[in-house]
Every structure is written in C-alpha cells, then in structure tokens.
C-alpha cells in the first residue's frame, strides 16, 4: 500500500478511531476507560506515526533510485517543538482526527497540550534548523538533519523569588512516540588515545591513532513531514552509550558506582545541551559532544553514499554538508581523517573533496561566540584531529604568506591556532578554511562578517562569502499557530500562501476594508484573551486583553537589550506615580526567555524584570494601565501562544550585534508591529513592509562602530544631560524595586553610567519617543489595523522555503525529487 493509499484509508473518522483504540489496547495494554490524557496522546501519536512509515520508506526509495544529491544539516540544536498537531496538519488529517477523538469523548486540544516540547535546542539557532527541515520536506528535497538526542535538553526554567532556577527537563520521561530507534545502524566512535608512527616501505609518515576508548552512537529518527505529505524526511538523533562491559566482579564487591563508571561517563555526552564551559570538565564534555555529533553523522553519511558508490570520485556531487554555526566545525578534520586514514586518499585529493562538500553558516557577530578550544584539551581528547588541524594550518599559512609575503600580523589574525600562553584552536577559522561557502544570515550581518568579523578571509576568498537571509516556516508559525487568521486569509486570497508565502501580497487590497479590519481585530482579541489565560495560569497575574500586548520573547542576553525595555517601563512608572502623568494607553509588558546557567548578568536581568513587575503590578495607582509579566520556561509551544497575541514586537538589539533574528519575522507574519533598531533582519523587514509600517529608533551599526573606534561615547553625559534618562537611572538605583535586597541593582546603574557596552543610554531617548508614537497610533484602530495587515501581506520574503531554495541553488546544488 502506498502512502497516498494509506492516508486515503485513514482519511475517515472511523478508521482513525479504530487505529487509536488498537494502540491503546496493543501498544499501551490499557482499556479505553482507564486511559489518561497522556495515554490518549501516545495512542494517537503512534496511530499517526503508522501513517508516516510508508511515506518515509517511499521517500527514501525515491531518493535512492534517483541517486539524488543529498543535504546533511549538522546542528547542535533542533528546536522542533511539539509534533502531533504539526504532523496532522501537514498530512491533512487535523480535522478528521479532531472529530475522531471528539466522538470518543476527548478534546484534541487537550491531548496536544500533554505532549512535551522536544528539548533539543535553546533559541533561534535550533528553531531555524527545524524550519529548514520543514521547508526541505515540503519542497521534496533530500535533506536530513543530524543532531544529538539529549535526554534533558537545556533545562526547565522555573522562577523562584524572581530568580531563574534551572531544573531538569525530562521531556522523554514517558518515551517519545516520534522517535524510531535504529540500533542496527549504531556506530563506533573512537576518542582519547595517542598517536604512533607506523613504518612503511614508502618512507612516508603513517600516523596510527591507538589506545583509544570508544563511544557508541545509537541513532533514532524523527520523521519530518512535508506539507501535503509529498516527502517525509527525517532528523537523525544520536544517543551515546559506552562499549565497556559491566564489571560484575567490582559490583559483587559492593562498588556499584565504579562498576558502571565507564557507561555513565560515555552517556553524559547526550545528557544535556551546552554543559557549562566555565570549568575544565564542562569544556571537555562540550568538545566531546561536538565531536560525537560530527563523527556519528559522518559515518552515517558515508554509509548512505556507499549504497550507490564504491569510490569517492563523486562524493561532492552526491553529498552536501552544512555546518550550522561553529559547533560542527570539527567536520572539516573528521572528513579529512576518514578520507586519509580509513580510505587511503592522498592529502590533496582529500582536501579537494572536503572543501567541495562543506558549507558553513555563521550566526554571530560576537567574537566570544566563535568557539575556541585549548590545544592541550584537543591533544588529550582528539589527538589525531589536532594533528590534521596543525597540517591544515601549516598549508594555509603558506598560502597566506604567498599572497601577503612577510605579513606576519595578518597571518597571526588568520591562523587556526591562536598563539599565546595557552594555545587555542579557533573553530570558526577551521570552518571557513575547510568550506567552499561561508554565509551570513541577513544582509547587514553578511556585510559585517566580511568587513568587521573576518575581513582577512574575505580578502583572500571573496567568492566564498554570501548572504542567505533567514526565514521561518509559515506552516507552523501562521497556519498552525494562528488558525483563525489563516482561515481569514484563505477567504480573502486563497490558500496558495501555505506553500508560496508571496501570495500574501493579495492582502494589501484588503488593508483598508472595514469588514476585513473588524474581523482581523476580532481574531487578534481572541488570541489575546487566550494568552491572558496562559499568563494567569503561569504567573498568577491577571492582565487586560484590551491593553497593548508589548512583547519581548527571546534568549536573555545583554545585547538583545531586555534591559532597555525595562528602562522604558521604569520611565512610564516613575512618570505616572511621581509626576501624575499616566500612560496614554494601557500596556501589558510580556517577557519570556532563558538565560544561560553561567551568565550572571542575564540572570540578574530576569530578576530585575520580575522585581519591577512585582512593584508595578501591586501598585494600585498604575496597575489598571500597566502590568509586567515574565512567563517562565519559554519554548516553541509557548511561542505559538504568545506570537499570535502580540500587538507590538520588541526587536531592540544593539545595532550590529544581532545576526538576523527570526522572531521578528514570526511576529510580523501574525500582524504585530515591530519596534526595533536597524539591526539584523529588521532592516529587510523595513524594506519590505515600508518604513511607515514599522517603528525604527536608535543608532545605526556604523554610528556605533565609529563611536567605539573613536571612544567618543560617554554614557555619563546622557545621564547628567538628559532629565528622563537621569530619572530612570535614579529610580533604578534608589532600591524602590529591591526594597528587600538593597543595592541589588546598583551594578546595573554602575555598568550603564560607567561604560554601557551595549549603548542603552544612547538609544533610550529615541526609544522613549518612539514608544510615545506607538501609544498614539494604537489609539487609532483603523490606522493600526491597516499597518498590521500590510505587515502580514508583505512578509513573503521571510519564508524558510525561500531561504532553503537559495541554499539549494547557490550552495548545496540539490533539487526536488
């Protein structure tokens, strides 16, 4: 039976009911009357998975018969969220399944809410990877993700006394019905050990990696369903286990811990995402994780290639590997090692294959985010890879000096090895040198990569550098997250936008239609009322759905400037209670996002948000017109509730710091207006929607760079010379937001007035003025609705389908099959 026939057979309420009941009985071994909501979810998910299996096998067969070139996307993060609703939607079974469960006395929405988010990522990096996989499958392209099957993910965030607390995220505690275990395709991964020279008759150097220990990578596949079921690709996730035998003799002597020591050490590799690198053990574990991902993926890629090929002559014509940020940069050394050590290729041939196969996406302009590892750690953990990296660097150094003779300073800047008291391996440089393509993720970002981050490399290889502006999948972020708006759009312009987002342009002719505006506003209000219930359940704070929902949800980081948002809140609060000037319009300030466990300043900013909220929300003088809420444990499923309800999208990073951002695209797609700096993709959003339909403020990236270079920025002058700035900072320092912990936020005052690394005070006056404009225009419902509809109509450029097509044509050279 083909997948189409299988879906047709299932495309009936009774058929799906029977499948769910069968899995309740034969998979869960339960009577229907004993089923919990979680049980119903599991039975339903397995029934849906049955429908996917034929599609997975048929898709794989189609790709293999065509001997199509395939993309392998390596990423430490894949933030896929929940899968049941998404899979039903893409299969066209959502309404049928809803009715099937309703007839069984169960609400599908309640069932979907029991599914845990897959804890396989943290922020935009992982969500972008998930959007790309969705687009690849929808476009029918052979593209597969490779990642780590984290047992706990990053962490579950709880808020205690205003502070972030990290708890384990047991997302797989009850198993995942979407993971198809593949123990027969497990692979052996060598690690540690030492290098020996093996003599040979050819008098060449033949290094042998010996005395290594072993990790075993066990894969599980998560199906990725393309819209309409045209193709079902997969995300392959690896768990780490040890090959060490359980030592029964030690166990019998009573030392259980020692008996399982090796197993536990290996399994740590796939326990958590991003273990803290503030201590040596954490750094070693991170390096092991990155190597584990790369080595497992490489073995599987080679296994797939060898199904149709016996030599490596066509490897770059059949295989494209994309490194998503620097975490998989070891792919360069690992592919070289495999080609040279395991397949006896000469260096030059192996290098030609490697560079023709690999592409690298850079996601940052923060130098500290371009990973570096101590060479001493490399030598202990991956001695053969360090040898190969030294050889790559030696040959690269000769190339640099041939082009720029005697320019030792340039060579120092470009070298993979950072010399100093403690040698470091620069992973970003390794990725650039080993790839044929290096791309940024927004026009400004790509420009700054070549002019500011790695200008020497751009001068050497200008043809390698290109831009691929990020995108998001409209199927999850509009069709699934905002079904009422999706139906309104369908009635106006049809449903072709689901697979070609440019069709939303047709909404422009509806932007001033009174009836359309009324329905658009009604849908936004329903979404706000739903979010208000979520906020109350999560925080205990009741908010007014008629207020402006002013939203900033993203990873907590100083450059993203949640602090600037808080300074505006403090300004409005102090102005109201001290001067009696109330805000023009009621606002609910919504925050969400996680801070890295070791990032003290970011965690203190979370505390500040909650402390300000505690004061504002309990002050009867203002709490009818101001509320501040921090929703804990931000994740994809929560974003799907927040984004459709937002009126105002805060995209306020310091110009020149945000690579792209994708939240900005999701909010605009759902009819929120953006207040933001000219940074990342905000610039391109402004170009698309028109400057009259976005609220831009603040310094430009080039202005900030000039001030840095000339050291002309004096935040104290803003404090002393601007009464509004002074009033806000004095309130911050006065302990009125930390009465129980005096002096708690003094460091923020000192930081802002002292050096203000992220230019908060320079941008604050412009930000406050722009927020006043927002308040005035929100009070003009017709104008606001017009702008919001225009935003939705003009986001066609920001579909991940467009992004993936550009990668496919310009970098990967893959096609739909």
Segment roles from a protein language model:
Residues 1-817:
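A conserved ligand/cofactor-binding region detector
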């Amino acid at each position: 039976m083909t997948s189409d026939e299988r879906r047709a057979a299932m495309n009936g309420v009774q058929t799906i009911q029977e499948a769910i009941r069968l899995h309740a009985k034969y998979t869960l071994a339960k009577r229907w009357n004993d089923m919990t909501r979680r049980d119903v979810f599991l039975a339903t998910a397995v029934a849906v998975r049955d429908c996917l299996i034929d599609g997975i096998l048929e898709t794989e067969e189609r790709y293999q018969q065509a001997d199509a070139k395939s993309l392998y996307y390596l990423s430490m993060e894949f933030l896929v969220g929940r899968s049941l609703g998404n899979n039903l939607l893409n299969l066209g079974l959502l309404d049928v399944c809803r009715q099937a469960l309703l007839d069984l006395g169960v609400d599908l929405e309640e069932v979907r809410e029991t599914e845990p988010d897959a804890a396989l990522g943290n922020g935009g990096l992982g969500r972008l990877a998930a959007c790309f996989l969705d687009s690849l499958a929808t476009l029918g392209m052979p593209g597969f993700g490779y990642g780590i099957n984290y047992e706990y993910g990053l962490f579950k965030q709880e808020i205690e006394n205003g502070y972030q607390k990290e708890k384990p995220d047991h997302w797989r505690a009850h198993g995942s019905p979407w993971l198809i275990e593949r123990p027969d395709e497990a692979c052996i991964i060598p690690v540690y050990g030492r290098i020996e020279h093996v003599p040979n008759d050819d008098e060449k150097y033949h290094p042998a990696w010996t005395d290594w220990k072993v990790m075993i990578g066990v894969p599980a596949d998560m199906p990725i369903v393309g819209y309409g079921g045209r193709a079902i690709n997969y995300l392959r996730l690896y768990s780490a286990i040890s090959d060490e035998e359980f030592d029964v003799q030690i166990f019998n002597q009573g030392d259980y811990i020692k008996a399982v020591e090796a197993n536990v050490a290996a399994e740590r590799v796939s326990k958590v995402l991003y273990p803290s690198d503030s201590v040596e053990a954490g750094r070693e574990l991170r390096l092991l994780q990155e190597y584990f991902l790369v080595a497992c993926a490489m073995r599987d890629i080679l296994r797939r290639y060898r199904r149709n090929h016996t030599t490596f002559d066509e490897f770059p014509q059949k295989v494209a590997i994309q490194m998503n940020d620097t975490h998989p940069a070891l792919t360069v050394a690992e592919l070289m090692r495999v080609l040279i050590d395991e397949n006896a290729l000469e260096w030059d041939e192996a290098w030609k294959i490697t560079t023709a196969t690999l592409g690298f996406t850079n996601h940052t302009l923060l130098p500290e985010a371009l990973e570096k590892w101590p060479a001493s750690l490399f030598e202990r953990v991956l001695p053969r890879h360090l040898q190969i990296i030294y050889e790559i660097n030696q040959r690269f150094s000769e190339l640099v000096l041939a082009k720029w003779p005697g320019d030792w300073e340039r060579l120092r800047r470009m070298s993979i090895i950072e010399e100093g008291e403690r040698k470091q391996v620069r992973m970003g440089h390794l990725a650039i040198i080993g790839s044929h393509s290096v791309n940024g993720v927004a026009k400004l970002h790509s420009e700054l990569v070549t002019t500011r981050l790695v200008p020497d490399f751009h001068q050497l290889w200008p043809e390698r550098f290109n831009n691929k502006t990020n995108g998001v999948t409209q199927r999850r972020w509009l069709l699934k997250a905002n079904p009422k708006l999706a139906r309104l759009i369908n009635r106006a312009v049809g449903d072709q936008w689901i697979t070609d987002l440019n069709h939303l342009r047709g909404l422009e002719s509806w932007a001033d239609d009174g009836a359309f505006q009324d329905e658009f506003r009604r849908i936004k209000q329903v979404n706000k009322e739903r979010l208000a219930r979520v906020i109350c359940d999560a925080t205990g704070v009741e908010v007014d759905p008629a207020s402006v929902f002013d939203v900033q949800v993203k990873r907590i980081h100083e450059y993203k400037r949640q602090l600037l948002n808080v300074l505006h809140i403090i300004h409005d609060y102090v102005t109201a209670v001290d001067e009696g000037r109330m805000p023009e319009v009621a606002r609910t300030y919504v925050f969400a996002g996680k801070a890295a466990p070791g990032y003290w300043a970011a965690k203190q900013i979370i505390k500040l948000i909650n402390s300000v909220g505690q004061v504002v929300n309990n002050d009867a003088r203002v709490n009818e017109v101001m509320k501040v809420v921090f929703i804990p444990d931000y994740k994809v499923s929560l974003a799907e509730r927040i984004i459709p309800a937002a009126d105002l999208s805060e995209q306020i990073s310091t110009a020149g710091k945000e690579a792209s951002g994708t939240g900005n695209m999701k909010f605009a797609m759902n009819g929120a207006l953006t207040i933001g700096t000219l940074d990342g993709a905000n610039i391109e959003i402004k170009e698309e929607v028109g400057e009259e339909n976005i609220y831009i403020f603040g310094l430009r990236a080039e202005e900030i760079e000039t001030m840095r270079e000339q050291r002309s920025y004096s935040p104290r002058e803003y404090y002393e010379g601007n009464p509004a700035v002074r009033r806000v900072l004095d309130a911050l320092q006065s302990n009125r937001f930390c009465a129980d912990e005096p002096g708690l936020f003094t460091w923020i005052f000192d930081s802002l007035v002292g050096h203000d690394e992220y230019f908060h005070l320079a941008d604050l006056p412009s930000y406050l003025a722009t927020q006043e404009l927002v308040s005035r225009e929100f009070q003009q419902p017709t104008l606001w609705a017009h702008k919001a509809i225009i935003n939705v109509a003009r986001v066609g450029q920001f579909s991940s389908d467009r992004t993936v097509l550009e990668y496919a044509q310009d970098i990967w050279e893959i096609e739909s099959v």
